[in-house]
């Protein structure tokens, strides 16, 4: 086999410097490496031995950079995103911001249509009993599932994001969550009683076993995903042990939904269970993102040969959110910031952010993914970001001092003392 070697002067991820030496009288110019000594782990390379050298395979070119051959040479950016910018908890969201910042065009990925001649609506029904807690529920189905390891490019990208690759189906859901910021869940279709999904509140003291094998005691404030007979998932947090994907799965139901953020946060705390999915849901997701995410997942399933996507989509969207419209108030923005930015310049900033201006009634139409833009000060903040914080003049707080009048207490106090 072909293995990686560290030469004299190289350092391991632990900081140990590799030096020339002699081993049993034979001169050694370096050290052959295990996967851990290359800065990775068996979590991301499950075929690596528990101890010993990692065989990189016959495709590895002798003399090439081992880190590059393993795909570990990629640059990883870490962003500290404030909780109000949930749209940036995804690759697409960061790309949108980067395009606006660097004056580039932002183009959403073109998702190819998927699905055979069957109709998913003939195979599953969805009933949302509480539209306030479940704003949208999208479902698609995949049959003839072929579980297998994901391709290396996907495993590497997941590993770079700190996610352990498992199999093609699980990896696709995680990959799309990173791309679109939309959590998804997969259920074994053959375990769904009556081929029916019901989104309802839990019953007080209802006990439910989650995927991690733990029994959770619920109450009526928590939202459940159920079939015709039983609960199969704790909405937005974790699926159930009774509907999990196993190696024997043949047909799968994909779920992409938009649950109420405050409810998910409270439910996760009550259940003592916080997951990557609940962490995203609790910040409040864009309901219009669910459809694109589930279609992207189905595109990847066909692309990777992981199964046959059934045509159509079940889409329950009880109450579509009203479009947010704010008045365009450039004078107020400048007053708040202490700047003198022209109206035209402000509108250029807003256009980059996909905020549409309606000249007829002087209003700004806020895109659904910008849930943080609610009032005048929020719009002023957007102006400040693109105008440049460094250009905003530094001024000290000022106020007008007046002598004022003495209160009755101050007037009467000297009299009393006399």
Model feature map: region roles:
Residues 1-408, 412:
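RNA/tRNA-interacting regions in translation and RNA-turnover enzymes
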Residues 413-418:
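Short "domain-exit" segments at the C-terminal end of structured domains
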């Amino acid at each position: 086999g072909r293995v990686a070697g560290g030469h004299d002067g190289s350092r391991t991820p632990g900081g140990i410097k590799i030096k020339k030496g002699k081993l049993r009288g034979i001169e050694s110019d370096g050290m052959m490496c295990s996967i851990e000594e290359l800065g990775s782990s068996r979590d991301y390379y499950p075929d690596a031995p528990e101890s010993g050298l990692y065989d990189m395979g016959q495709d590895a070119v002798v003399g090439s950079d081992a880190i590059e051959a393993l795909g570990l040479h990629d640059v990883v950016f870490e962003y500290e995103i404030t909780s109000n910018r949930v749209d940036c908890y995804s690759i697409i969201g960061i790309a949108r911001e980067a395009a606006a910042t660097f004056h580039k065009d932002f183009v959403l990925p073109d998702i190819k249509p998927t699905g055979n001649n069957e109709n998913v609506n003939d195979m599953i029904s969805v009933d949302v009993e509480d539209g306030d807690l479940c704003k949208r529920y999208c479902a698609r189905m995949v049959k003839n599932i072929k579980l297998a390891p994901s391709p290396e490019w996907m495993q590497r990208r997941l590993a770079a994001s700190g996610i352990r690759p498992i199999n093609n189906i699980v990896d696709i859901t995680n990959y799309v969550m990173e791309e679109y910021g939309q959590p998804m869940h997969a259920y074994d279709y053959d375990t769904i009683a009556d081929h029916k999904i019901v989104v309802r509140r839990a019953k007080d003291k209802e006990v439910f076993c989650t995927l991690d094998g733990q029994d959770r005691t619920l109450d009526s404030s928590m939202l459940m995903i159920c079939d015709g007979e039983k609960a199969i998932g704790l909405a937005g947090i974790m699926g159930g042990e009774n509907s999990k994907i196993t190696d024997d799965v043949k047909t799968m139901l994909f779920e992409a939904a938009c649950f109420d953020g405050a409810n998910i946060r409270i439910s996760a705390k009550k259940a003592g269970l916080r997951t990557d999915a609940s962490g995203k849901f609790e910040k409040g997701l864009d309901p219009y993102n669910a459809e694109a995410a589930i279609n992207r997942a189905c595109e990847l399933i066909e692309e990777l040969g992981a199964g046959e996507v059934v045509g159509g989509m079940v889409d329950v969207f009880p109450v579509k959110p009203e479009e947010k419209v704010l008045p365009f108030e450039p004078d107020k923005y400048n007053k708040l910031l202490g700047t003198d930015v022209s109206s035209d310049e402000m509108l250029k900033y807003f256009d980059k952010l996909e905020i549409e201006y309606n000249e007829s009634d002087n209003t700004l139409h806020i895109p659904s993914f910008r849930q943080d833009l609610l009032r005048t000060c929020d719009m002023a903040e957007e102006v400040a970001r693109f105008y440049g914080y460094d250009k905003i003049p530094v001024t000290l707080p000022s106020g007008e001092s007046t002598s004022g009048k003495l209160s009755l207490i101050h007037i009467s106090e000297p009299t009393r003392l006399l």
